[in-house]
Regions:
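Non-catalytic helical/linker scaffolds that mediate oligomerization, partner binding
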Residues: 1-290
Length: 290
């Protein structure tokens, strides 16, 4: 019987080892390398290491159109605490990547950082520094996603780092790529033009704009991934089940196309040997949707 369920696993510090990679040979369909946490200079070495132990296909997942924090040391921030944001990477201050985003930020912008609900408001901007104030306490850590609450800011659909990574990956015969923060059918077409016809592409749905444009996006590609984590930064958590069901309903009109579901499927198993009843129900319901 042909296997209908496919599993993508992200390789991180705890799974990028010989034992897990050998296990992946018969249990996992695609091994994901997240370029948000890998430098292009490291990529070739990681690919070669993976291939020593497994024949499972590797997928290079781009950073895409996302803002991220750059800090040298994590720290807890209290409500009403003042904070400075630097135009460029700085040991003393928070900076934001891609660095050109500094130019687009305005007074009264609200930045939602990471998944621990840290909120900061921009109070003033002068030369190479922004003065901000914490309006909801939380932990400030490096390389965490930043969502601008009050308005949309245009960002290039892939970064210069992504372009370097794609060249290195293609040189190493990688055939699977994912576009993070796909927002429109134009993003799909641009990504396809960069990669060519010989590569498999997964387009990640993780913004309100992508949900709105999904009817058009799905017509131009074959593989999609609903990232419920980043999507929950753009819509409320209580809307996630409804949105997931809506996207799966649209997919029913395109039977040969695939949708993967990501985030919190088996979160409790970081600490426990078995999933919770809620997680089991979530996975079953997702599969039942198609």
């Amino acid at each position: 019987m042909k296997k209908k369920i496919q599993i993508i696993t992200t390789l991180g510090p705890s799974s990028l080892n010989a034992a897990f990679l050998k296990f992946s040979n018969n249990n996992i369909d695609l091994l994901r390398l997240n370029m948000s946490h890998i430098e292009p200079e490291e990529l070739e070495e990681k690919i070669k290491f993976i291939r020593k132990f497994t024949k499972t296909n590797i997928c290079v997942d781009t950073e895409g159109a996302q803002i991220r924090t750059k800090v040298f040391k994590p720290r807890d921030l209290k409500k009403y605490q003042n904070l400075k944001i630097s135009r460029v990477k700085d040991k003393k201050f928070l900076s934001l990547y891609p660095y050109e985003i500094f130019e687009k930020l305005k007074t009264k912008d609200i930045l939602n950082i990471g998944f621990n609900n840290l909120l900061i408001e921009i109070k003033s901007k002068k030369n190479n520094l922004i003065n901000a104030k914490v309006i909801r306490a939380g932990k400030l850590e490096n390389n965490k996603g930043v969502h601008i609450e009050n308005r949309k800011i245009g960002i290039n659909f892939i970064t210069e780092k992504d372009k370097k990574a794609i060249l290195i990956a293609k040189k190493n015969n990688i055939k699977h790529f994912a576009l993070s923060f796909t927002n429109s059918s134009k993003d799909v077409e641009k990504f396809k033009a960069i990669l060519g016809d010989s590569c498999q592409k997964i387009f990640k749905i993780e913004t309100k704009r992508a949900v709105k444009n999904f009817n058009k996006i799905i017509k131009n590609a074959d593989n999609f991934l609903i990232d419920r984590g980043d999507l929950s930064k753009d819509i409320t958590v209580v809307q996630i089940p409804k949105i997931q069901r809506k996207l799966m309903e649209i997919k029913k009109n395109f039977l040969k196309k695939k949708i993967f579901i990501a985030t919190n499927l088996l979160e409790s198993m970081i600490e426990n040997n078995y999933p919770t009843r809620g997680e089991a129900n979530d996975i079953y319901s997702s599969l039942e949707m198609g």
